[in-house]
Regions:
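Classical Sec-dependent N-terminal signal peptides that target proteins to the secretory pathway
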Residues: 1-25
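A generic "folded-domain core" signal
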Residues: 23-179
Length: 179
């Protein structure tokens, strides 16, 4: 009996050590994925882990990139699909963004869970975008996006969590890898 208890204890200890290491490794993990015509570099959020910040480049022009980000919501708003193709106001690191973000996908996952994917406007020079984002990141030590209110739209109506942050450590290297 003692041997069985010892073996179970050792297995449990090893499982916890490996699990803890895996969780810590995922916090700083970047994903670089190649698709038919574009490459995506992505990072999980700190507030909501499943919400990703994605940088995408067309394989034919790796000098310009765009940004996609998602917000998951558990609010069961009956008109959440009405957000499709809308432009929503956002703040980045507390600064209002004039061009806002366009909703490109509203996807129901489960009965009460939806993912809303948005795109920051336009493709920008990789160099200029990385420099601007890293300046914001180094100033506050995070890169945060917040959904904000405007006349006719209150993000609290649709989203239970209206902000997320991402660590951008190693972003320049990951973009170079994606290029």
């Amino acid at each position: 009996m003692r041997q069985i208890l010892l073996i179970l204890s050792v297995h449990l200890f090893l499982f916890l050590v490996l699990f803890t290491y895996h969780v810590q490794a995922d916090e700083d993990q970047w994903y670089v994925e190649e698709f038919d015509t574009f490459v995506v570099t992505a990072k999980n959020g700190e507030v909501t882990h499943g919400d990703k910040l994605r940088f995408f480049m067309n394989k034919g022009d790796c000098s310009r990139m765009g940004i996609l980000f998602s917000f998951t919501t558990m609010k069961n708003h009956k008109n959440i699909q009405s957000l499709q193709d809308k432009t929503l106001p956002i703040k980045i690191n507390g600064h209002q963004v004039d061009d806002a973000a366009k909703v490109i996908l509203v996807q129901n996952l489960f009965r009460d869970m939806n993912i809303v994917m948005m795109q920051a406007p336009g493709l920008k020079s990789v160099k200029d975008m990385i420099n601007a984002m890293m300046a914001w990141y180094e100033d506050k030590n995070f890169f945060g996006i917040e959904l904000v209110s405007e006349p006719g739209f209150d993000p609290q109506d649709y989203f239970d969590i209206t902000d997320n942050n991402w660590k951008l450590d190693h972003l320049p290297e990951k973009i170079i890898e994606a290029q």
